[in-house]
Amino acid sequence: MAASAKVTVGSHVWVEDPDDAWIDGEVEEVNSEEITVNCSGKTVVAKLNNVYPKDPEFPELGVDDMTKLAYLHEPGVLLNLKCRYNANEIYTYTGNILIAVNPFKRLPHLYGSETMKQYKGTAFGELSPHPFAVADSAYRKMINEGVSQAILVSGESGAGKTESTKMLMQYLAYMGGRAESEGRSVEQQVLESNPVLEAFGNAKTVRNNNSSRFGKFVEIQFDQRGRISGAAIRTYLLERSRVCQVSDPERNYHCFYMLCAAPEQETERYKLGKPSTFRYLNQSNCYALDGLDDSKEYLATRKAMDVVGINSEEQDGIFRVVAAILHLGNIEFAKGEESEASEPKDEKSRFHLKVAAELFMCDGKALEDSLCKRVMVTRDESITKSLDPDSAALGRDALAKIVYSKLFDWLVTKINNSIGQDPNSKHIIGVLDIYGFESFKTNSFEQFCINLTNEKLQQHFNQHVFKMEQEEYTKEEIDWSYIEFIDNQDVLDLIEKKPGGIIALLDEACMFPRSTHDTFAQKLYQTFKNHKRFGKPKLAQTDFTICHYAGDVTYQTELFLDKNKDYVVGEHQALLSSSDCSFVSSLFPPLPEESSKTSKFSSIGSQFKQQLQSLLESLSTTEPHYIRCVKPNNLLKPDIFENINILHQLRCGGVMEAIRISCAGYPTRKPFNEFLTRFRILAPETTKSSYDEVDACKKLLAKVDLKGFQIGKTKVFLRAGQMAEMDAHRAEVLGHSARIIQRNVLTYQSRKKFLLLQAASTEIQALCRGQVARVWFETMRREAASLRIQKQARTYICQNAYKTLCSSACSIQTGMRAKAARIELQLRKKRRATIIIQSQIRRCLCHQRYVRTKKAAITTQCGWRVKVARRELRNLKMAAKETGALQDAKTKLENQVEELTSNLELEKQMRMEIEEAKSQEIEALQSVLTDIKLQLRDTQETKSKEISDLQSVLTDIKLQLRDTQETKSKEISDLQSALQDMQLEIEELSKGLEMTNDLAAENEQLKESVSSLQNKIDESERKYEEISKISEERIKDEVPVIDQSAIIKLETENQKLKALVSSMEEKIDELDRKHDETSPNITEKLKEDVSFDYEIVSNLEAENERLKALVGSLEKKINESGNNSTDEQEEGKYILKEESLTEDASIDNERVKKLADENKDLNDLVSSLEKKIDETEKKYEEASRLCEERLKQALDAETGLIDLKTSMQRLEEKVSDMETAEQIRRQQALVNSASRRMSPQVSFTGAPPLENGHQEPLAPIPSRRFGTESFRRSRIERQPHEFVDVLLKCVSKNIGFSHGKPVAALTIYKCLMRWKIFEAEKTSIFDRIVPVFGSAIENQEDDNHLAYWLTNTSTLLFLLQRSLRQQSSTGSSPTKPPQPTSFFGRMTQGFRSTSSPNLSTDVVQQVDARYPALLFKQQLTAYVETMYGIIRENVKREVSSLLSSCIQSLKESSCDSSVVNSPSKSSEENLPAKSSEENSPKKSSEENSPKESSGDKSPQKLSDDNSPSKEGQAVKSSEENSPASSWQSIIEFLNYILITWKKNYVPLFLVQKMFSQTFQYINVQLFNSLLLEREYCTVNMGIKVKAGLDELESWCSQATEEFVGSSWDELKHTRQAVVLLVTEPKSTITYDDLTINLCSVLSTEQLYRICTLCKDKDDGDHNVSPEVISNLKLLLTNEDENSRSFLLDDDSSIPFDTDEISSCMQEKDFANVKSASELADNPNFLFLKE
């Protein structure tokens, strides 16, 4: 319709709008697929196929019948309904369908006897649409055609179905006359049956105050004269569950509230009170309806019962049963003396039980037994079974529901019997008042049955509309083809098909006692998983969705089975059938013996389906008439028309489908005269040449080239969109004509204006040109005169200026020349004096410089001689040190070679033991392999049996087996890759052997370097002798004197050097002795760890490197000594020439010779060291050869073990794969357990087993050096396991704090950093540490224990966040600093690197975190959040108890201060004041270790004496239970919490978050309590609450912002509410003051609630002004219904994330933290002290 319409620029169209459904506008631009529309100033771009044409000639008040619309589409229908609704015309036809829009107000002009007279006998469609017209049409057809009629009224709850039904029955009663029946008219009885059924079958719902909770079909019988001769009422699916369950703000059935509002003598007889005292009624806060008096309705219902023939005795029995149901609801059950027995809870329950028994007129004990016990009849005997309290409560509710259902059925039967049916009547008019389509947030069995009814009626409706369309085409005698319409038969088959439908499956599930809603839902999923109308919600497990004609509806199956079962408990049946009250016993007649013996299961669904089928059979024999009731808005207020809401109802009611069916044929139908009048302009010649309307219409349509139209007898029938195309042609013709007219008019106006403008411009130009010429001539005259005047004036001025300038220049030149001569003379005098002064000063300066230079030269010479002597002494010292180092190195090498030989002998013995253990292990593995094969064979047999038994699920098992095979293939590929990795490692080991050959080559180079060293030493000695000889000759020749002090210093340095050499020799002897003592210990350690050979080789390599370094340093020093000797020779010559010393030279020569002899001794010592080095190298080569042999043997043994373990693991994996694929994906538990069983036997042959159960391969020897990264990582993974138990035993206790930092967290962190666990690829240490933190959650009641572990966990997490650095995606490790080459350099670097990490947060050590470390970090994060949540819930639980006591005390104090106390209020209305003893905070029995005192201020003298304990928080006596003491108990509890957290040094940001959420919880509890009851919204209550808030504010100020943060701001809702309560007088408060100044935070719902609750009837000044309340109420009506809750919600989320722990925790220096006392003396944890 929209796509085929021709849209041009200027056309008026409808465009979709999300707010108003459709808006109109004018087309501004048309593209190929999109158009631009101007909608009242707003430009909208829409697709061409999403717009509908608008009728520009639409009548202002709309049309009575929407089939007369030029464009029959959704926006046209909405516009027509809205125009008529605004004009109070609420009824509109759509063909034969009447649409009624509920006005929510009385319209007197539409009802009354006068209106009925107007419609009596009038043809359908002559008068305005009205239900009377529909009723009259049905009545006339029944009389004239002799066919029974039916009027179907449908619509949403609140759409006006009940009122429309009343009007229909009123009109039919008016038309049927007054045939008397036993003194009472039948029509009056039919009309009066409505209030009776409404009292017992209607209730208030969210959408309607008088919603029918049952379906009703009234059959009115007529005789041959058209008089009412009888009637029958049929009801469907009464909502039983409403008797026991009512949601707020709905109500139960009206009869309960009417009976409670009955006269006093009635309520006393039935022992009733207010509705709020009964559990079946007080589940909702709504007890009364606006504009409805329940007491008057009670009397009206009594009168209606009299009319329909229910006598007073029966009426008394009816209300006796209703009262008994109310008393049944107040019976509560508790556990009895036996374990699974139950009994009435208290005296109150026994009272209601007694009253209910009296009203039922049965035995009270029998009633109690029927509720608390069940009799199970077996073949031999009867067994009495006791019920628990929950089962007894369910039985009580079942009894109430079945009694009420029986009562309602009795009423319907009684009404039918009273009215009577005419057996001779052949024609009826049925009025169906049925519930409309329902879709709520929670849809149960009732909605399922209601929507099934609507599906049935919709199918009937579609078929009927299609038939009417057929009749219209046949009447006009046009050619038409079949019209396709939606057939919802597939939905009906889905629901009611037997077998296989949803109802059939539900009945089947109800017949099995063990069936639950879960099994029922799974059965539905399996049966209808491929059905296009059935779906399963993604996030639900038991819900299902059905695609109805009106939309998708999701049903919850929780109560389907219970609501579908229609049974009466045998005990209840027997009890009530034997009642002394005849009315009660008539409700439960005794069952026939045959039916009781052979009872067949009957369900509500099956009964309802049968009733529905009977209804449709009745409707099929009648001619239907349809009335669709529409609710214009959800506010239930007049004059509000919501387009989207109405459009949804029209779709659900099938109106739009009827329109679609109409549009599928020929929706546009115009009479000939109207068609020609509208479109004559397209072809004027057709109307001029012919007066035949039919012929003219055909010519007109042929000219516009329209296809597919039909010409009927009286009308033109157009297809969908053809009317828009005709309007488009008409708009083009009108537009073209308008443009021609506009062009001619504009041409005439423009020409006329141009001629006038031309004449005027000619005159103006002549005048202007004359004026311009005159002005130009005058200007030329003035310019000529001015030039002559200027010439004369300039000549005179120039002459005078020249004369003055000449005289001035002569005067100035004279003065300047004189001044220059004087200046020149003065300069010459100054220059002569300056030369004289400079010559004297330069002479003096040269003399002084010469004196200073001479003195400095003498001083420099003396200092230089001292420097030369010291340099020589330093060289001698260095030579002595190098000699000692060589001796030490040689001794160590000898000792290590001896140790290596002894270790080799031990290794041979160990290899023999390994071979024996290997053979034993192979035998064990073979036995295990045999067992596994047997298990495999048994498993296969079991599997084959299961497959044969479970052939129905063969497909699923094949899929699982396919997944298992894929997993096995993947595991096999992983094992093959692991085998390849092991082969690569073996190749690396062989490369390691080649490395020993490289070491031998390096040893040869060492020999060469030692020989070169010897040569250089000899050369240095030779040079030294030459220098000494030259010095002696110079001394003899020139008689120099050596500085005595320098020689003395040289001697002392020489003595020190000797002492140093002797001390080094003593140290070498001591090291030899220690080595002899420690060698046995090293031998035993070799037995424990096979990898010791790697350490020996690495030590040898390090020693080799050290020797190289020593040789290099000696060469460097020798070179320096050679250079120094040359320099000294030259310096000596200079000294001998410059100065002459006066000391005796002979003595000095002897000392020099003595020093030379000592130097020779040192050279001899060096040569002996070289010999020892040669011997050490030989021993090293032999050790290398032995190590190579040992490595080969170890590799062979490890290869055999690894192959056996690999085959073992593969077999175990196959068995585990066949047992469960899911278990393999999570963790290879079987392989892990098997590997751990084998690990003690082979622990000495390799690394320990990993977490996943695979054996870690032998660490490969790197290609170049033993100290590579992979080798060290394997070492660090094995090292700390033996120390973890000691660590865990220590930190699992409360080891306290040091300097305010947790010792346990820092100890764990230091150990993990020391052991390099964070860099390990696989480790089980984290799995052993995590349970330590998990143990803190086990004791959830100990706040002190939880706070201690929260501090430790958060601190450790903080350190990990600062330390761990995740590896880059490439996996390359960061660049490391260069490694020193010498042995001592590497040792010192190792000491520095393995020391305890610097824990200052400014320089936290960064490490590359592996996957186990990152997983450990995530686990710590989860524990921090869990501990925080547990502590918060403990605090909330205690605060809730204290607040309950506080609120109770406030209420009691306000009741004491009031003048009158209401004695009728039951104790149940009071807020329950829980004993704080139940939820008091439990203090830990353990005390923290001594902590350093902090300088924090304690709020309100925070001390341990003030902190509440279990005993201190018990329920106080009535004398102490005052508001002040209650608030004080809250303050004391907050003090206790703060002290606990401060003692445990909980991070400040966590403390602030905790108090913030605690105060938020206090705010929610106080604020909700104020808004829930009227007695709390008083000035006295506000003053008392304000006093308590002042106490909390004082506590916050004393506790300081450091701990509580902005917690005080969380009480803003309660504070503002209290301010409003205590403000006096309230009548002067304006709306702006209320919403801006006083209560800016509160919402409109909350303000309206407070203002309405704090009303005082006696004093108007205490009330808020009505204007303010009306403004708030107006805002409430405009706001969304979803924002109607005035209560606050508690926030239970975690208020921080992991990143906040790192950013919010204050940076601390952890360097000064003391270690735990238990680890202080342990030598393995000495690094903690560093």
Swiss-Prot record:
CDD domains: MyosinXI_CBD (cd15475), MYSc_Myo11 (cd01384). Keywords: Actin-binding, ATP-binding, Calmodulin-binding, Coiled coil, Motor protein, Myosin, Nucleotide-binding, Repeat. GO terms for molecular function: actin binding; ATP binding; calmodulin binding; cytoskeletal motor activity. Residues 1475-1508 have a biased composition (Basic and acidic residues). Residues 883-1224 form a coiled coil. Residues 61-731 form the Myosin motor domain. Residues 1367-1387, 1456-1520 are annotated as: Disordered. Residues 757-786, 782-811, 831-850, 853-882 form the IQ domain. Residues 8-56 form the Myosin N-terminal SH3-like domain. GO terms for biological process: actin filament organization; actin filament-based movement. InterPro entries: Dilute_dom, IQ_motif_EF-hand-BS, Kinesin_motor_dom_sf, Myosin_head_motor_dom-like, Myosin_N, MyosinXI_CBD, MYSc_Myo11, P-loop_NTPase. The keyword Transmembrane helix does not apply. Residues 1456-1465 have a biased composition (Low complexity). IQ domain mediates interaction with calmodulin. Myosin heavy chain that is required for the cell cycle-regulated transport of various organelles and proteins for their segregation. Functions by binding with its tail domain to receptor proteins on organelles and exerting force with its N-terminal motor domain against actin filaments, thereby transporting its cargo along polarized actin cables. Homodimer. This is Myosin-7. It comes from Arabidopsis thaliana.
